[in-house]
């Protein structure tokens, strides 16, 4: 079933602005103490789940490195990387998410740039601008990934790295209500899944709320194969559970990849 909906970027911008107002987990800024520890070299950031990303996936010394936190607003990863010495740009679709980064930067005296936009269009940046793109779990909010990978490849310098977190697409097989409310794994959806094609606007409003963000599953071909097709070389793979999802006792809910732009 498919209905006419607003552009997903516009819809999800409003949804995430609301999440910030509600205090969503991924919209809670790091503390001043976290920033101070990062300045002293004691820091960690999350790419998938709640586990710190493997520090070997990032440059040993971040000082002077140009880092793009892609679809990564909320005042979490960007400020920590800036405190660790990187030149950070946070790019996000939600003004309020970016506002969290701006707040931390002002509070703690960090140099940090924020840019509003859709992750599929990075035309705000020139070719070979960044050394690292840090892209935590967020591409479930756009329907197509090929533009994301093409743009990431373009804006990275040769030898630059792309760190990506994404949902295991199998999570979308299951009935959301049965899973979230009763912990039951009931297969009801065909993959790849989309809120837009699976439910009408009225059904979405009933099941998730009219203001909930639109989500899209993506195949592993789109996630990993898409990076390879864009020109990246895959050098790392990790997985993690979803701490509050009943399916975690049977499978990993998150994957992470590390890829390099040759050169």
Enumerate the predicted regions with their spans:
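A short glycine-rich, Lys/Arg-flanked "PGG" loop and its adjoining helix->strand segment in the class I
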Residues: 146-161
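Short alpha-helix
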Residues: 214-237
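A short acidic, Gly/Pro-enriched loop at the edge of an enzyme's catalytic core
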Residues: 120-133
